[in-house]
């Protein structure tokens, strides 16, 4: 005989408003709680308020050119 499972659903915090979001197929905007929070986050990336750290871009002032290769 098996015991009935009473597992709690996996939840995550909405990256924008920190509300709890159940992680399943019925949460269409996951990890966001709503379309509004999803669009706020998208706008922050588009305005470059958020970024992924990395090496700085090379520019012409760095002495780089295609002729060196």
UniProtKB/Swiss-Prot annotation:
The keyword Zinc applies. Zn(2+) binds at residues 14, 17, 33, 37. NCBIfam families: PRK00418.1. Interacts with GyrB. Residues 59-69 have a biased composition (Acidic residues). Binds 1 zinc ion. PANTHER family: DNA GYRASE INHIBITOR YACG. Residues 46-69 are annotated as: Disordered. The keyword Zinc applies. GO terms for biological process: regulation of DNA-templated transcription. Inhibits all the catalytic activities of DNA gyrase by preventing its interaction with DNA. Acts by binding directly to the C-terminal domain of GyrB, which probably disrupts DNA binding by the gyrase. SUPFAM superfamilies: Glucocorticoid receptor-like (DNA-binding domain). This is DNA gyrase inhibitor YacG. Its cofactor is Zn(2+). Keywords: Metal-binding, Zinc. InterPro entries: DNA_gyrase_inhibitor_YacG, Znf_NHR/GATA. Belongs to the DNA gyrase inhibitor YacG family. GO terms for molecular function: DNA topoisomerase type II (double strand cut, ATP-hydrolyzing) inhibitor activity; zinc ion binding.
């Amino acid at each position: 005989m098996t015991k009935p499972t009473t597992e709690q659903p996996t939840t995550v915090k909405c990256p924008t408003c920190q509300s709890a979001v159940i992680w399943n197929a019925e949460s269409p905007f996951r990890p966001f709680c709503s379309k509004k929070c999803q669009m706020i986050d998208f706008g922050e990336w588009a305005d470059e308020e958020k970024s992924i750290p990395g090496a700085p871009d090379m520019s012409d002032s760095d002495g780089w050119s295609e002729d060196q290769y």
